[in-house]
């Protein structure tokens, strides 16, 4: 479903940071300022967000993987919830350096987590001493928190969706190194450099974060649904062709 200007206004997408903290590279997206707070031009944001959704839709239709990244307190739950709804991986606790550039190491940790989860399923905890079980539970909880969202990510993602590029500089840098497209919310205090699909907007408001994440998740689901419909229609077309020539 398309996001509207009214929804963006209600979510506070237009509220930037204090004028003294601004990044001049965001000047083209700033409408003005009020009470020393920069106001983002939603007439720029809305079409740019629509472009980002269009790209996401196409990527999802081609079975692409989009990694959701949002580790700030106000975005953690929403990022996990919307990524899961869209069937995509996510990082919402802390970005571990090398998550993409050193994927081999991440794969080792993922294997460890999956092995531990399998052990729990098999009832192995009951065979351990209290101390062993406690240490085991602590380790599995730590792994689930840090990499639980990426445990089913088979390889480097086809794109990453980031809320707050300043807070996730390492993630953006890793994506840039690997040539992975970056879709990101960029507030007035950060630079849009290194971002392929810039979404100028408030990156602190939980309502705004929910709007972005829901919009991206919706686009992914739409892209997948469109791809399925095309396959079904193509199959029907083949059937009709066969019937006509039977």
Curated annotation (Swiss-Prot):
Keywords: Ribonucleoprotein, Ribosomal protein. It comes from the Bacteria. This is Small ribosomal subunit protein uS2. PANTHER family: 30S RIBOSOMAL PROTEIN S2 PROKARYOTIC AND ORGANELLAR, SMALL RIBOSOMAL SUBUNIT PROTEIN US2M. One of its GO terms (biological process) is translation. Belongs to the universal ribosomal protein uS2 family. CDD domains: RPS2.
């Amino acid at each position: 479903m398309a996001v509207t200007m009214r929804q963006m206004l209600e979510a506070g997408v237009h509220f930037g940071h204090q004028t003294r903290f601004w990044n001049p590279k965001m000047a083209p997206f700033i409408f003005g300022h009020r009470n020393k707070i920069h106001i983002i031009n939603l007439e720029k944001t809305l079409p740019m967000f629509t472009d980002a959704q269009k790209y996401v839709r196409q990527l999802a239709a081609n079975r692409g993987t989009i990694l959701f990244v949002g580790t700030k307190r106000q975005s953690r739950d929403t990022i996990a919830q919307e990524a899961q709804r869209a069937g995509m991986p996510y990082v919402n606790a802390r970005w571990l350096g090398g998550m993409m550039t050193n994927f081999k190491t991440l794969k080792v940790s993922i294997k460890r987590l999956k092995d531990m989860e399998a052990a729990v399923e098999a009832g192995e905890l009951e065979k351990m001493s209290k101390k062993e079980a406690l240490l085991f539970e602590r380790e599995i909880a730590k792994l689930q928190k840090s990499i639980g969202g990426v445990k089913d990510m088979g390889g480097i993602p086809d794109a990453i969706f980031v809320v707050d590029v300043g807070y996730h500089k390492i993630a953006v840098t890793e994506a840039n190194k690997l040539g992975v497209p970056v879709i990101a919310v960029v507030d007035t205090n950060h630079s849009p450099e290194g971002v392929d699909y810039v979404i100028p907007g408030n990156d602190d408001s939980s309502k705004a974060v929910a709007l972005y994440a829901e919009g991206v998740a919706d686009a992914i689901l739409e892209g997948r649904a469109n791809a399925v419909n095309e396959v079904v229609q193509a199959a029907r077309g083949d059937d009709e062709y066969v019937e006509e020539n039977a």
